[in-house]
Every structure is written in C-alpha cells, then in structure tokens.
Amino acid sequence: VCAVSKQPVGIDIERIGAYQPNVAGRVCSDAEQKLLEQCEDPARLFYRLWTLKESYVKLTGTGISVPLSQITFSFLADGRVESNQNRVQFASFPFGDGYWLAVGEKMR
C-alpha cells in the first residue's frame, strides 16, 4: 500500500481473525463495545476498529502508550468513519480477501 499526502498519514492492514472479546474489552470504548454486542459479525467490526486505532497511533507516533479505548470510532450509514480525534480524517474498507485496511490523515 502506498499513500501520497502533504500531511502525515498512518496506515494499518490486518487479516480478519477470530473475534477476541477480552482484547475488545481493553481497547474499545463503551460505545464501540455496544456496537460489537449488537453486530452480526463482531470479528469484522473488531478488526475494522482495530485497524482504525492502529492507523491513528501510527499517524501520531504515540504507539500504544495512549489508551486505545479513548480513541473512539463510529460509522455513518454511507460507510464514512467518524472519530473523536480532532483534525484527523479516516477511511476504512475491506482489502483483498479477508483483510481490513484503515488510513488516518491529519487535516490542515
């Protein structure tokens, strides 16, 4: 994957594996955990959330020293990603067979 931007970018790609509720309990916000509980396919949603969080920490360079549960994502009906992180825009989508890709980019 290649990204070209005048602003910093963070990218993450993960293979969709088994849903890990114990990990989700540590890294997902309360709102995200509710989404996972209501979801028909929690594994896909978990890895979508995970790649978004990873793209953010790669973008900022903070690593996982930031509590990932404080970075919250939600999804609009048209698939766009919303976040509580100001001045960052995100995109997330299936990539290849069985993978999620997420990109975060600082806004000007």
What are these regions (language model features)?
Residues 1-108:
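Core catalytic alpha/beta fold that binds nucleotide/phospho-ligands
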